[in-house]
C-alpha cells in the first residue's frame, strides 16, 4: 500500500469531560478516522493535567494520543473536524517515522 503514512496525534481537550465522556469522544473520532480509510488506530488517554498557561479560560486539560496510518489526502478532512470541535483546545499531528 503505497502512500500510507503513520501519524501520531496529541489532542488537548477541555477538562469538562468525565472518564466515560472522554472515552466516548475518543471513540467517535477514532470512528471518523476509520471512515476516512485510516488503519492501525490506537487511542491512549494521557489524563488530566495542569496547563502551563491559560488556554481559552482553561487552566486544566485532558490529553488524548491517537496513533494511526492513513493517506495524507484524508488528513485535511479530519483536521477540519477537530478545528470546529469546541472541546478541542489544541492539537498536533506528527509524521511517525517507521
Language-model region placement:
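Long, contiguous binding/interaction regions
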Residues: 1-61, 69-98
Amino acid at each position: 500500500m503505497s502512500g500510507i503514512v503513520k501519524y501520531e496525534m496529541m489532542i488537548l481537550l477541555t477538562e469538562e469531560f468525565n472518564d466515560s465522556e472522554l472515552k466516548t469522544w475518543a471513540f467517535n473520532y477514532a470512528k471518523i478516522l476509520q471512515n476516512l480509510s485510516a488503519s492501525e488506530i490506537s487511542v491512549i488517554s494521557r489524563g488530566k493535567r495542569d496547563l502551563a498557561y491559560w488556554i481559552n479560560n482553561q487552566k486544566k486539560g485532558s490529553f488524548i494520543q491517537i496513533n494511526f496510518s492513513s493517506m495524507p489526502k484524508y488528513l485535511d478532512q479530519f483536521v477540519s473536524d477537530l478545528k470546529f470541535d469546541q472541546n478541542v483546545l489544541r492539537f498536533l499531528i506528527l509524521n511517525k517515522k517507521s
